[in-house]
Design a protein with these regions (language model features):
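A short, well-structured juxtamembrane/interface segment
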Residues: 35-48, 66-69, 202-217, 231
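Glycine-rich beta-alpha junction loops
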Residues: 9-15, 60-62, 88-89, 151, ...
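Phosphate/pyrophosphate-binding active-site segments
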Residues: 135-232
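Acidic/glycine-enriched edge-of-secondary-structure segments
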Residues: 20-37, 89-103, 198-200
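Structural motif
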Residues: 53-55, 119-121, 223
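Glycine-rich, anion-gripping cofactor-binding loops and their flanking helix/strand elements
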Residues: 58-145, 238
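Conformationally flexible catalytic loops at phosphate/diphosphate-handling active centers
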Residues: 1-51
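Thiamine diphosphate
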Residues: 232-238
Length: 238
């Protein structure tokens, strides 16, 4: 949302081009919403979300975490939204699914169809289940809203429709103040049933066993640094 912006567009030689295209292709519009926004705007958005299946994808680096969670919790309770996240993102919101990678791997085709969201709301940065969720959601006919202070255009599912350049807690608080409690309370329950079905099997000594044993013995409020790739994925299962 802030400039200056410099765009380099490489052009091949123009020789042999007849410039016969008369109409530009129809493209999907991405709307940037910036503060201040009127109460009427928030009422329209709350009405738009009413009765819809809402999926929040919660990534890393959301600050200040406690304030955002407080605002998000009220929104989640009223809308019956589901939160797909991971342990690394340190999210503690209600209706949160932490073993998202496993859940996406064991979902049946019928469940994938019935649990498709109407709206995707993304906050934060990277998440461990990036490849799995993109494989499922990319190109799906739903609306994607991205919320964050930076106002970045991040369109991993090819359905981004709106960007909310603002603190995440402000976004959730404004909608929660207006929204009525949803009568559709089955969406989050269906996700939780699938999430609670798998567990970590008993295993002999291996990398996953060693990581599991170590992490379970860490004191409360420890600061843990993890190397990239497989170390993060195995730590996520604990």
């Amino acid at each position: 949302g802030r400039g200056p912006v410099h765009i380099n567009i490489p052009f091949a030689t123009h020789h042999g081009v007849d410039f016969s295209v008369e109409n530009l292709p129809v493209v999907r519009k991405i709307t940037l919403n910036q503060l201040p926004l009127t109460m009427e705007f928030w009422k329209e958005k709350a009405q738009e979300l009413s009765g819809k299946k809402i999926m929040i994808i919660w990534g890393q680096s959301v600050y200040p975490l406690v304030d955002v969670e407080k605002g998000a919790d009220e929104f989640i309770r009223k809308s019956d939204a589901i939160v797909l996240t991971d342990n690394i993102s340190n999210c503690h919101c209600c209706n949160s699914i932490f073993n998202t990678t496993t859940v996406l791997a064991i979902m049946k085709p019928t469940e994938m169809e019935s649990l498709k969201p109407d709206y995707i709301i993304t906050v934060g940065g990277n998440y461990i289940f990036n490849n799995e969720i993109k494989r499922w959601l990319k190109g799906m006919q739903c609306k994607h809203w991205h919320v964050g202070r930076e106002g970045e255009v991040c369109d991993p599912f090819r359905c981004l429709s709106e960007i909310y350049e603002m603190p995440e807690n402000h976004f959730f608080e404004q909608l929660a103040k207006i929204m009525e409690t949803s009568s559709n309370i089955n969406y989050s329950k269906q996700w939780k049933v699938i999430s609670e079905s798998p567990g970590i099997p008993e295993m002999g000594y291996c990398e996953l066993f060693a990581i599991t044993t170590l992490l379970k013995q860490l004191p409360i409020n420890s600061d843990l640094q993890l190397a990239n790739s497989q170390t993060i994925r195995m730590s996520q299962f604990v």
